């Protein structure tokens, strides 16, 4: 058999939830048009993605879209996707760059929780100190929400010390890494770090963080999925590709 000669064939997930994607057109630095959005969705579907949480950037003192505007765009994109027979369901979210008034803006519903629930995709600057991120996680948790720390591998204080990731996860934060980091797109050191997280089962979600329909920031996840199923426990991989997102966010 071919799989005996060349190694075990990777399982294909029945569902894949992309929890981090800049798919909505003209709203941030992601897709620039509905045409590009549809191309991104076609790529995502071909990669096995079945559900996408749209996570446009939300940054204090920027010209951010309101949750209502995000909803309107999602409805329009979903209609176009259906019209073009692209079998993907899109949900509301934001990628929120943490700021000190987070709780006030959350209470005022200024930005989107993930699918109207209790999870918020939360971003930091690469050079933010661990004490700042730890305090931010505590602040978000105090609101009753759970921070999903976006692309944790980008933060110097995390990538230099896996125990810092363990600490914020033990506090109650969830951890997201990018699919491209698993395959080496972020470089050797990043790849080594995310695989150390995966070995310790410190990752809760995989996202593409896609911004474009071509180049290096497209919604590719199949190569990542194949690697995960070959290297790690199948039930754990199921959970980070779709199970956790289905249970905690999409429900």
Predicted regions and their residues:
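An N-terminally biased module of ancient metal coordination in phosphate/nucleic-acid-related enzymes
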Residues: 1-86
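Mid-to-C-terminal alpha-helical segments outside catalytic/metal-binding sites
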Residues: 4, 222, 226-251
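Hydrophobic "anchor" residues on beta-strands that sit immediately upstream
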Residues: 14-18, 52, 119, 147, ...
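Active-site beta-loop-alpha junctions enriched in small/polar residues
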Residues: 22-24, 57-58, 93-97, 125-127, ...
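Short acidic/histidine-rich active-site segments
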Residues: 202-218
């Amino acid at each position: 058999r071919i799989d005996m000669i060349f190694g075990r064939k990777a399982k294909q997930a029945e569902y894949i939830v992309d929890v981090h994607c800049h798919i909505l057109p003209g709203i941030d630095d992601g897709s620039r048009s509905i045409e590009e959005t549809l191309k991104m969705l076609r790529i995502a579907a071909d990669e096995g993605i079945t559900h996408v949480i749209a996570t446009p950037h939300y940054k204090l003192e920027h010209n951010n879209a309101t949750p209502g505007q995000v909803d309107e765009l999602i409805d329009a994109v979903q209609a176009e996707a259906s019209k073009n027979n692209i079998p993907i369901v899109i949900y509301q979210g934001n990628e929120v760059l943490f700021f000190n008034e987070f709780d006030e803006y959350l209470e005022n519903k200024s930005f989107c929780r993930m699918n109207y629930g209790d999870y918020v995709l939360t971003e930091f600057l690469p050079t933010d100190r661990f004490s700042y991120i730890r305090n931010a996680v505590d602040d978000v948790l105090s609101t009753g929400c759970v921070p999903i720390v976006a692309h944790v591998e980008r933060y110097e204080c995390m990538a230099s010390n896996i125990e810092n990731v363990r600490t914020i996860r033990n506090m109650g934060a969830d951890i997201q890494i990018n699919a491209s980091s698993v395959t080496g797109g972020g470089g050797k050191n990043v790849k080594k770090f995310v695989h150390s997280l995966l070995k310790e089962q410190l990752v809760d979600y995989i996202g593409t963080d896609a911004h474009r329909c071509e180049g290096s920031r497209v919604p590719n996840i199949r190569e990542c999925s194949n690697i995960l199923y070959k290297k790690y426990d199948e039930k754990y991989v199921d959970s980070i590709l779709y199970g956790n997102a289905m249970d905690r966010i999409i429900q």
